[in-house]
Amino acid sequence: WNSVVLAYKFIDYLDQNPTLIPENIVVTVIPSLNPDGIYKIIGKVGRFTSLDVPSGKSTVPGRFNANEVDLNRNFDCKWQPKSKWRDSVVSAGQEAFSEPEAKALRDFILKDKPDAVLFWHSQSGAVYASECEKGILPETISIMNIFSRASGYRAITTFDAYETTGDAEGWLASIGIPTITVELTTHETIEWEKNLAGIKALFEYYK
């Protein structure tokens, strides 16, 4: 849930500081791709703060949507019906993009054609590149290193803790969109200053 709180904070910050965004850049912030999962944990619809999060409650159920599908295994990059998340086998849906949330992001991406995408997750305290079956895009390496230097997060080119299939980041890489994932250090903190520094560095790079 902390990555969602961070996204909302960025929305507020950019609304209050519009001149921070270079004139040639359009920024879209999607706070969460999984409202069902958020509702399982928070118990409310729409925006929330850290004060709304029940203490001591497991956040694992919030990983999955109402169909008990891991949405970050439902994209068209080496998709399989079953995938892994940590030590667990998880459902990746009936087929790639079987879930409405994954379809919504796919349709938005194909319509808007962003120059770059950044995901916020937690927790490992690092920024990761993305790849599918054709390797890492050179631009992805560039923005990963730029964000890493500005924020202080470790830069990691390949996630190798366990094999993943059907991830959104990999799908974006497969269609030629540079994508990085910033993993916050814990499941509670938003590390605002580090992430603000990283975003400012990306604005400077793309202006």
Language-model regions, residue ranges each:
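Active-site/substrate-binding loop(s) of hydrolase catalytic cores
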Residues: 1-138, 145
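Short, surface-exposed, charge-dense and proline/glycine-enriched linear segments
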Residues: 50-62, 148-157, 186-200
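Conserved beta-strand segments of alpha/beta enzyme cores
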Residues: 26-28, 154, 178
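Generic non-transmembrane alpha-helical segments
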Residues: 104, 108, 143-150, 201-205
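Active-site-adjacent mobile loop/cap segments within catalytic or ligand-binding domains
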Residues: 116-119, 126-138, 159-207
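Short, flexible loop segments at boundaries between secondary-structure elements
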Residues: 141-160, 167
